Design a protein with these regions (language model features):
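Short, hydrophobic/glycine-enriched beta-strand segments
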Residues: 46-54
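Generic beta-sheet signal
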Residues: 49, 186-194
Length: 252
């Protein structure tokens, strides 16, 4: 797998330098350039798999909802999904797949409609398991301030409070390979969640999978795009068609 300079043009920026000030047309040109720099357009061996994070969720309680049922997109989240569908219009998307959770399925709907394809479901795209699910985890007034929860935090490298990073990376890599095969020579969109997408990216870039959650580059409705030549990953691109969001927002 070639991974030299996989994110140079877009992804080496800090969260404060990107997103909100990135015009949508500029972002569209950047991802177009990133997705075609290494391989020529029309190349039958070229496949792009876009990993999209779902849109904003209606979460007035501010809890970490994880895999809990019933968490739908907010009005803003629905608009974000439509913006990404418009952003991708005109590209060669032939396969759309989503996590089974409601917010991911809702995010995928306008994209499937834009390209007139049915939205498939892949369990491997689901949100990561988390032992703080259903609790508030904001700094100062959340579950993290309670001593009874501290034993869950003993190993941040695994992590001890949830699904192992390596397990997340392996299942997401499996989802990526299935999408690549389904869209061979074209493009696919996989709608998933922040931690699974970010873990996959760090795994592919050969970086440690443990990290500071405040530094994740995976905004709501963002696209992390894997460019393949055949089975070889040749580039990773990142854009925020719906603008930047704060990675510290609970349950986003």
């Amino acid at each position: 797998m070639s991974n030299s300079e996989p994110t140079r043009a877009l992804s080496d920026r800090s969260p404060g330098e990107r997103g909100a000030n990135q015009p949508r047309e500029t972002a569209k040109r950047e991802i177009e350039r990133e997705a075609t720099t290494t391989v020529n357009r029309g190349d039958a061996e070229r496949t792009v798999v876009h990993f999209m994070r779902h849109g904003e969720v209606h979460n007035p309680e501010g809890i970490l909802y994880g895999r809990l049922p019933g968490y739908r997109l907010s009005d803003r989240g629905e608009q974000q999904a439509k913006l990404v569908a418009e952003f991708l219009a005109g590209r060669d998307v032939v396969h759309v797949v989503a996590s089974p959770l409601q917010r991911a399925q809702q995010t995928a709907e306008p994209i499937g409609a834009t390209f007139q394809v049915d939205v498939a479901t892949d369990e491997r795209l689901i949100e990561s398991e988390n032992r703080f699910e259903g609790l508030k985890v904001s700094v100062g007034d959340g579950a993290l301030s309670s001593p009874k929860h501290w034993p869950k935090l003993w190993n941040p490298l695994r992590p001890s409070w949830g699904e192992p990073y390596l397990q997340i990376a392996h299942r997401m890599l499996g989802a990526a390979q299935r999408a690549r095969a389904a869209a061979a020579g074209h493009e696919a969109v996989c709608v998933s969640h922040q931690l699974p997408i970010w873990t996959l990216r760090r795994f592919l870039e050969g970086k440690p999978m443990w990290h500071d959650p405040r530094r994740r580059q995976c905004s709501l409705a963002s696209l992390t795009s894997l460019v393949f030549r055949g089975e070889e990953l040749v580039r990773i691109a990142y854009v925020e068609p719906a603008g930047a969001t704060d990675p510290k927002v609970t349950g986003a």
